[in-house]
A protein has these predicted regions:
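N-terminal amphipathic/basic-hydrophobic helices that include classical n-h-c signal peptides
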Residues: 1-18
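Short coil/turn linker and secondary-structure boundary residues
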Residues: 3, 94, 136, 248-251
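Intrinsically disordered, low-complexity regions
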Residues: 16, 128, 253-257
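ABC family nucleotide-binding domain
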Residues: 22-236
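Conserved beta-strand-loop-alpha-helix hinge in the C-terminal portion
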Residues: 240-264
Length: 265
């Protein structure tokens, strides 16, 4: 099935004069699944919005609805009812192929397990999202990939394969890949889950730097200390939001990193 580009453009342009500047606008979102003869209600009327430039952490234990919400935010799943506007586009109205196009254009994904192609260089891994964008030439693709790797301080690792990089460096490549398509938001799923404390702080310091540059970041984690590096925390339980609050005392990951003992100590 060919993506109807004209329809996607039309949906984005629809009612432009009424558009808000919210990156994410979710209202009364519900998601139900059939498991055997039972109906499982994973999300039970969730509502929240995220403004440009926010750094939001989403937390919740197993069964809270966190994974379902993550899949919805990433346009990997559609709600049973309610609305999800991503950069003013109503996700529920899009076909599967249109959702894939929207994902590629609007969202930069960062995963816990990096999801890098093993036999592909850092540069080539970062270029991958741009291969699906026919408007980007090979020269522009190369330029953007270099700039993204420079932004995560890996300019000297362009030709390295994943197995030639540390875990922290692999995650930096994944972050560069998330940045390369100039998305409206970065969606990170447990991005420090496989890293030690020092490397976790290095990655969170990078996310804080990107946020200071104006990047909108949604960071899913189960670690309360990681949430303190963001400006806002949303907590889910049993399909409901039980907490949505600004973080009054945001920790600096750079300062926390500087306070760690050196390897020789």
């Amino acid at each position: 099935m060919v993506v109807d580009k004209a329809r996607v453009v039309a949906l984005i342009a629809l009612n432009k004069d009424k558009m808000s500047n919210k990156i994410v606008d979710i209202q009364e979102l519900r998601r139900e699944f059939k498991m055997g003869g039972e109906i499982v209600k994973a999300l039970k009327g969730v509502s929240f919005a995220i403004e440009p430039g926010e750094f939001v952490t989403i937390m919740g234990s197993s069964g809270s609805g966190k994974t379902t919400l993550l899949n919805t935010l990433g346009c990997l799943d559609k709600p049973t009812s309610g609305t999800y506007l991503l950069d003013n586009v109503d996700v529920k109205k899009l076909s599967r192929n249109e959702l894939a196009k929207l994902r590629n254009q609007k969202i930069g994904f960062v995963f816990q397990s990096y999801n890098l192609l093993a036999r592909t260089s850092a540069m080539e891994n970062v270029e991958l999202p741009l291969l699906y964008n026919s408007a980007v030439s090979a020269g522009e693709r190369h330029k953007r990939a270099v700039e993204a790797l420079e932004a995560v301080k890996l300019k000297d690792r362009l030709d390295h394969l994943p197995n030639q990089l540390s875990g922290g460096q692999q995650q930096r490549v994944a972050i560069a890949r998330a940045l390369v398509n100039q998305p409206v938001m970065i969606l990170a799923d447990e991005a420090t889950g496989n890293l030690d404390t020092r490397t976790s702080y290095e990655i969170m310091s990078l996310f804080q730097e990107l946020n200071k540059e104006g990047k909108t970041i949604i960071f899913v984690t189960h670690e309360p200390d990681i949430a303190t590096f963001s400006s806002r925390t949303i907590v889910l339980k049993d399909g409901h939001i039980i907490k949505d609050s600004k973080n009054e005392n945001i920790r600096s990951a750079k300062e926390m990193l500087a306070g760690l003992p050196t390897k020789d100590e």
